[in-house]
Amino acid sequence: MRTSRSVPPWNVAKQTRTFDNVVIVTHGFGSHKDTAGTVHFAEHLTSKYKNYAVIAFDWPCHGADARKKLSIPECMTYLTLVVDYARTELQAQNIYNYSTSFGAYITLRYLIEPAIRPV
């Protein structure tokens, strides 16, 4: 997860800053959270708009995630955990999503699943 350029991804859980607005970036199949496009998006957004944070994470079997099997339910769990983190730890009032490809598919499933509260 990445909240801004100044907070390394391994320290994000230890931070105490809150943000009114959080953008969750969900990448496509075969990609990962640290692509140049994601980094550029996060840097540009957080430098232009104050009180915004960007969270990027890896789906199962992608990037730094060590899992060997990809499943849609597990992806839904990952997204739910990230949304919950944005709401509780970062105290986000507004949560936005920037998605590509597979990430957009999971996000749309997340939004229409009745058992999961939408962003």
Identify the role of each PLM range.
Residues 1-18:
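N-terminal cap/lid segment of alpha/beta-hydrolase-fold proteins
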Residues 15-59:
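Short, surface-exposed "cap/lid" segments of acyl-processing enzymes
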Residues 35-36, 65-69:
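Conserved catalytic-core motifs of eukaryotic protein kinase domains, centered on the activation segment
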Residues 69-90:
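Alpha/beta-hydrolase active-site loop
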Residues 99-107:
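Gly/Ala-rich beta-loop-alpha elbow adjacent to hydrolase catalytic centers
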Residues 109-119:
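Conserved hydrolase catalytic core segment
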